[in-house]
């Protein structure tokens, strides 16, 4: 039955438009013949803010909410620009979208793809997914300052953990693990020190685990997790954690699997009540913008996550396979740098070959 995907596209700043352009080319090539793509571009980002004074208005949110999904490039301007200080774009755009659209799952697959060199001497088979809670923890904005600027200043940042928020995240992790070959969930926290929040997470995992007898479960403190990520990353299958620990884990996970230049992510609302957003993890790199130097691989892998989320797993697998083939060919062939468009061309050729 014919289907149309309504996609909001936010190219953003710096290299964002270049990598998104290639990601869209791959997406159009990957979707099945009975699926059409209807894209609407939005100008949000640092450049838009500097021109208009607006970051993301209520009417912007209402427009974005009408789409099936969002593809984001990268946002952020010149870090030396005082008008952009304090993470104003990241908070006003990315975090605002996350909370407004209840993106309570931050999904970060970590795979050491063929031809990619890990900084680890013997990484083994690296293939795991981090399920990070996305709307609570210390990022919820529950905190404040008293006596600012004095020697008696008090700053608080409260980590918010609700039974509802923890359970829906844990259930997502177990559902995901049950579909994977190794079927294993690792809870990462610091229950020996953060006893109140840690207890809530552990009790929730224990309760949900009882409903999934086919899924193995273990627990690691976050500091031990950091050690195992660099000494034995192949032990992990699905990691579930809170917002702060998940944020830290995912960056190290990207580093051991080739760097953030290859890392894709999904900010997901699994209920479908709002569109989920998919993006490369890397920044806007304004120093190389417009020079065709940026590698669009992470943006293309974000398209794979997008397709899988929209119920097109075969198309998603084809995109990942095409990226894997291109990375392997790069490692075996000419090491000379390729332009952004040339990488897109190569992935599309690989897609066509594996159709």
From Swiss-Prot:
Enzyme class: oxidoreductase
Annotated positions for site Important for catalysis: 139, 190
Entry GO terms, CC: cytoplasm
UniProt-listed PROSITE patterns: IDH_IMDH (PS00470)
Range of residues in the leader sequence: none
Reaction equation(s) it catalyzes: (2R,3S)-3-isopropylmalate + NAD(+) = 4-methyl-2-oxopentanoate + CO2 + NADH
Protein keywords: Amino-acid biosynthesis, Branched-chain amino acid biosynthesis, Cytoplasm, Leucine biosynthesis, Magnesium, Manganese, Metal-binding, NAD, Oxidoreductase
Localization in the cell: Cytoplasm
Record's function text: Catalyzes the oxidation of 3-carboxy-2-hydroxy-4-methylpentanoate (3-isopropylmalate) to 3-carboxy-4-methyl-2-oxopentanoate. The product decarboxylates to 4-methyl-2 oxopentanoate.
Name of the protein described by the UniProt record: 3-isopropylmalate dehydrogenase
């Amino acid at each position: 039955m014919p289907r149309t995907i309504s996609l909001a596209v936010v190219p953003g700043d710096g290299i964002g438009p270049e990598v998104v352009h290639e990601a869209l080319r791959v997406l159009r090539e990957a979707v099945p013949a009975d699926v059409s793509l209807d894209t609407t571009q939005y100008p949000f980002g640092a450049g838009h803010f500097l021109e208009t004074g607006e970051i993301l208005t209520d009417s912007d949110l209402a427009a974005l909410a009408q789409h099936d999904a969002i593809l984001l490039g990268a946002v952020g301007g010149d870090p030396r620009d005082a008008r952009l200080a304090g993470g104003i774009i990241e908070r006003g755009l990315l975090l605002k979208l996350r909370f407004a659209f209840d993106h309570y799952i931050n999904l970060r697959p970590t795979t050491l793809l063929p031809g990619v060199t890990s900084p680890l001497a013997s990484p083994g088979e690296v293939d795991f997914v981090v399920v990070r809670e996305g709307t609570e923890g210390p990022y919820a904005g529950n905190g404040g300052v008293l006596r600012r600027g004095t020697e008696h200043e008090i700053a608080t940042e409260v980590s918010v953990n609700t039974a509802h928020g923890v359970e829906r995240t844990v259930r997502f992790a177990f559902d995901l693990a049950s579909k994977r070959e190794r079927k294993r969930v690792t809870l990462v926290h610091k229950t020996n020190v953060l006893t109140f929040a840690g207890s809530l997470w552990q009790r929730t995992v224990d309760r949900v685990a009882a409903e999934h007898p086919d899924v193995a479960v273990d627990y690691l403190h976050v500091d031990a997790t950091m050690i195992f990520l660099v000494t034995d990353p192949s032990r992990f299958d699905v990691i579930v954690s809170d917002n702060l620990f998940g944020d830290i884990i995912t960056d190290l996970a990207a580093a051991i699997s080739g760097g953030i230049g290859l890392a894709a992510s999904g900010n997901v609302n699994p209920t479908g009540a709002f569109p989920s957003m998919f993006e490369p993890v890397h920044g806007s790199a304004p120093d190389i913008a417009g020079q065709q130097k940026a590698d669009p691989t992470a943006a293309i892998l974000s398209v794979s996550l997008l397709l899988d989320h929209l119920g097109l797993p075969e198309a998603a697998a084809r995109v990942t396979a095409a990226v894997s083939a291109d990375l392997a060919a790069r490692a075996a062939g000419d090491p000379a740098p390729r332009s952004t468009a040339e990488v897109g061309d190569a992935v599309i050729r690989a897609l066509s070959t594996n159709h």
